Design a protein with these regions (language model features):
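Flexible interdomain linker/hinge and immediately adjacent N-terminus
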Residues: 1-23, 73
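N-terminal DNA-binding recognition helix of tyrosine site-specific recombinases/integrases
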Residues: 1-5, 45-49, 114
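DNA/chromatin major-groove-contacting recognition/catalytic segments
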Residues: 5-10, 78-82, 163-174
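Basic, Lys/Arg- and aromatic-enriched nucleic-acid-binding interface segment
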Residues: 15-48
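Short, basic (Lys/Arg/His-rich) helix/loop patches that form interaction surfaces
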Residues: 27, 97-101, 112-151
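Short, charged phosphate-coordinating catalytic segments
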Residues: 41-62, 147-151
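Short, polar N-cap/turn motifs at the start of nucleic acid-interacting alpha helices
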Residues: 59-61, 125, 144-165
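C-terminal catalytic core of Y-nucleophile DNA break-rejoin enzymes
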Residues: 71-90, 98-116
Length: 174
């Protein structure tokens, strides 16, 4: 009886979304704003908070500058595919967003709900970090050097880090 009470539960493995599933989630999203948010997270490996903080001043063609990222560094740079960069610039132009205004003026909670609904439309339980994890996994499987993937994934690739362990804790263990 006591053994059952204090049984150590097994940590379930994360389910990595396939490229086809992520593409379906993105293409089923109708609103351009929501689609851009999803693509920046899935293709650029950005956190939801980083996407919401973006301003037109941070966008330089394919290079996005993240000011005050969660990692604690002063600035970080994210590179996105050219087609996504073109759509982002077009969105900024169409909406006439000033250089210091946020591109996506929505709350963190509203963005999380949008991501969850996008996953529901595709029949997948989706959380914002699932898209970031997909980006890191896809990059590493595509032959991007592990050091580069690590820099965009909070210092350690997700597939090398035990679940529930932060990047900082994982680095201290090495």
């Amino acid at each position: 009886m006591m053994r059952k009470l204090f049984k150590i539960s097994e940590i379930p493995q994360w389910k990595i979304l396939g490229k086809e599933v992520v593409d379906e989630i993105i293409f089923r999203t109708i609103k351009p704003r929501n689609r851009l948010i999803l693509e920046l997270m899935a293709r650029g490996g950005m956190r939801i908070g980083e996407v919401l903080k973006l301003t037109p001043a941070d966008v330089d063609d394919r290079k996005l500058t993240l000011r005050e990222p969660k990692s604690g560094r002063g600035q970080e740079v994210v590179f996105i595919p050219q087609k996504l960069a073109d759509r982002l610039k077009e969105y900024i132009r169409e909406k006439e967003i000033k250089s210091e205004e946020r591109i996506f003026p929505t709350t963190y909670t509203a963005a999380r709900v949008m991501v969850k609904k996008a996953g529901f439309l595709a029949g997948v339980h989706l959380r914002p970090h699932d898209l970031r994890r997909h980006a890191a996994t896809f990059a590493s499987r595509s032959g991007v050097p592990i050091e580069l993937v690590s820099k965009t994934s909070s210092a350690m690739p997700i597939f090398q880090r035990p679940r529930g362990i932060s990047a900082r804790s994982a680095m201290l263990r090495q």
